[in-house]
């Protein structure tokens, strides 16, 4: 199984999807340009890569594109079957925050990070003024 930059297992079988996901992940977490493009390329390489859709949803959310974020979240949900428990929990955290359920999102993020402390994309939700503590 392929892993991301932080060593988390990814439900994708293509190195190209993983590589683009990692580029998007690092761009997103460092607030640099290119996250949306990289996550989009990851989805093009593997249309069943749930985490790439979630990265895209988060990128859209951060740029104020809420309708696009909801569409990407819906696509992630459609391809969740067969993913890991971490990826399903990752989806839940994103779904809660994107639907405005901040208290539930905060609790879900704490649980997720307790179970998977190397999942920086989710940990970031509670560690930034642009996240749940802002």
Language-model-detected regions and their locations in the chain:
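Structural marker of alpha-solenoid helical repeat scaffolds
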Residues: 45, 79-82, 115-116
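Asp-box/WD-like beta-propeller blade repeats and closely related beta-sheet repeat scaffolds
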Residues: 106-111, 116-131
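TPR-adjacent "capping" and linker segments in tetratricopeptide-repeat scaffold/adaptor proteins
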Residues: 2-19, 77-88
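Alpha-helical segment of the N-proximal tetratricopeptide repeat
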Residues: 13-41, 45, 91-101, 107
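TPR repeat positional signature
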Residues: 20, 53, 89, 123-126
């Amino acid at each position: 199984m392929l892993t991301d930059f932080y060593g988390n297992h990814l439900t994708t079988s293509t190195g190209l999807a993983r590589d683009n996901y990692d580029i998007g992940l690092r761009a997103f977490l460092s607030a640099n340009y290119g996250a949306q493009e990289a996550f989009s390329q990851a989805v093009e390489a593997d249309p069943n890569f749930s985490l790439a859709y979630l990265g895209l949803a988060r990128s859209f959310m951060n740029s104020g594109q809420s309708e696009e974020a909801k569409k990407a979240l819906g696509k992630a949900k459609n391809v969740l079957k067969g993913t890991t428990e971490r990826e399903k929990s990752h989806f839940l955290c994103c779904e809660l925050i994107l639907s405005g359920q901040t208290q539930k999102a905060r609790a879900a993020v704490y649980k997720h990070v307790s179970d998977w402390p190397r999942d920086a994309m989710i940990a970031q939700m509670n560690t930034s003024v642009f996240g749940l503590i802002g």
